[in-house]
Each structure stands twice: as C-alpha cells, then as structure tokens.
C-alpha cells in the first residue's frame, strides 16, 4: 500500500482547507498550507495522510505568505473579535503588598 499519498491536511470545520502547494512536493507526514492568496485561518488542521507516524501536530496557525509577498493584499481581520477586560480597582498604579 502506497504510504505517501499526495494529501496534506484538511480542516474539519469551516471553509478553510489546506492543500499541497503546487511548487512543493508533498512528503508523507508533512502538511503544507495552501498557496496565496488565502484568508487567515485560526482553525486546527487535522492530517488526513494515512501513513505512520502521525502526519502533523495540530496547532493554531496563521499563514504567513501574505506577509512576505506584497503582491497579495493582506487578509481582513474583521472576523477576529478581540475583547479586553479590566479588573475593577486597577486604575491606580500598582502598590506592593505583603
């Protein structure tokens, strides 16, 4: 049975999916991001390559190719909600306590 099938990673939920880059060869157990341009994905990819050892360690990732190539516009960050919370009583400068 062929181990190194030309498959990389697939995101189980959401529209984003990582595929093999056209300019790179997919080795067994290696996950490659899709080629530019693409949206920022904060989903955890799940490896679909059947060969041992486990292909990729799932981790939150942000594709960085748009940072290196000015030909593509930077993806919008409108979908990422950032909320900060300040504990009450912390407006004054910090004071050491015993």
UniProtKB/Swiss-Prot annotation:
Q: Which residues carry this modification: N-acetylalanine?
A: 2
Q: Which UniProt keywords apply?
A: Acetylation, Keratin, Repeat
Whereabouts are the sequence repeats?
3-7, 8-12, 47-51, 55-59
Asked whether the keyword ATP-binding is assigned, the reply is no
Task: Name the domain of life this protein comes from.
Answer: Eukaryota
Q: Does the keyword Repeat apply?
A: yes
Q: Where are the transmembrane segments?
A: none
Q: Can you name a GO cellular component term?
A: keratin filament
- Provide the GO MF annotations for this entry: structural molecule activity
Sequence segments annotated as region (4 X 5 AA repeats of C-C-X(3)): 3-59
Looking up InterPro entries in the UniProt record yields: Keratin_matx
Reported function: In the hair cortex, hair keratin intermediate filaments are embedded in an interfilamentous matrix, consisting of hair keratin-associated proteins (KRTAP), which are essential for the formation of a rigid and resistant hair shaft through their extensive disulfide bond cross-linking with abundant cysteine residues of hair keratins. The matrix proteins include the high-sulfur and high-glycine-tyrosine keratins.
Q: How does it assemble?
A: Interacts with hair keratins.
- Which family does the similarity line name? Belongs to the KRTAP type 3 family.
Q: What is this protein called?
A: Keratin-associated protein 3-1
């Amino acid at each position: 049975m062929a181990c190194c099938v030309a498959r990389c990673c697939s995101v189980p939920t959401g529209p984003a999916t990582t595929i093999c880059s056209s300019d790179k060869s997919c080795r067994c157990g290696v996950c490659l991001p899709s080629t530019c341009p693409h949206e920022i994905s904060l989903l955890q990819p799940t490896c679909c390559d059947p060969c041992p050892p486990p292909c990729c360690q799932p981790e939150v990732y942000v594709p960085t190719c748009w940072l290196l190539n000015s030909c593509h516009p930077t993806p919008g960050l409108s979908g990422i909600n950032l909320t900060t919370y300040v504990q009450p009583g912390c407006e004054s400068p910090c004071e050491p306590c015993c």
